[in-house]
Amino acid sequence: MAQPKKKTSKSRRNMRRSHDHVATPNVVYCECGEPIIPHRACSSCGSYKGRQVINSEDA
């Protein structure tokens, strides 16, 4: 197996890892006031873009 010729410094290691973070998800608020992920139907009221797409009994 290949072995590194030089020890990787903490600075170089951390610079390489600078893009490895987890992005925070976008949150929008439904008409009912519930926070939801964009482009998804609301799980509490069942609406999407102002229309009822899921029955209230199912949601």
Swiss-Prot record:
It comes from the Bacteria. Residues 1-19 have a biased composition (Basic residues). Gene3D superfamilies: Single helix bin. Disulfide bonds: none annotated. Keywords: Ribonucleoprotein, Ribosomal protein. InterPro entries: Ribosomal_bL32, Ribosomal_bL32_bact, Ribosomal_zn-bd. Pfam families: Ribosomal_L32p. The keyword Ribosomal protein applies. One of its GO terms (cellular component) is large ribosomal subunit. GO terms for biological process: translation. Residues 1-20 are annotated as: Disordered. One of its GO terms (molecular function) is structural constituent of ribosome. HAMAP family: Ribosomal_bL32. NCBIfam families: rpmF_bact. PANTHER family: 50S RIBOSOMAL PROTEIN L32 (PTHR35534), LARGE RIBOSOMAL SUBUNIT PROTEIN BL32 (PTHR35534:SF1). Belongs to the bacterial ribosomal protein bL32 family. This is Large ribosomal subunit protein bL32. The lineage of its organism: Bacteria, Pseudomonadati, Thermodesulfobacteriota, Desulfovibrionia, Desulfovibrionales. The gene is rpmF.
